[in-house]
Amino acid sequence: MKMICAIYRSTKRDQTYLYIEKKDDFSRIPEELLQSFGEPQFAMLLDLAQRQRLANADIEKVKQALTDQGFYLQVPPPVESMLNAYLDELKNSEKTE
């Protein structure tokens, strides 16, 4: 069975995507989310039933969110702080000495 979704890029947030059930149907998207997302730019249609995985999202979470709430918001992974990485490395080196 097909599970087609439309994917849109955010104009306000880099690497942020909105997956929805039907192209150009934003009726199930909360108004606050649409305002912070910006003008959605259509990226592609995708049949989730034909895929086993997605590049930057858990496909099962995407399918479940589309079924439950009618959309899935993909945000970029957090950028690791160089300071935190350095401090963690420092702590680990102190433990081994």
UniProtKB/Swiss-Prot annotation:
Domain YcgL, first and last residues per copy: 3-87
Regions that span the bilayer: none
One Pfam family, short name: YcgL
Domain of life from the UniProt record: Bacteria
InterPro entries: YcgL-like_sf, YcgL_dom
Stored Gene3D superfamilies: YcgL domain
Cross-referenced HAMAP family: UPF0745
Protein name, per record: YcgL domain-containing protein PMI1171
Originating organism: Proteus mirabilis (strain HI4320)
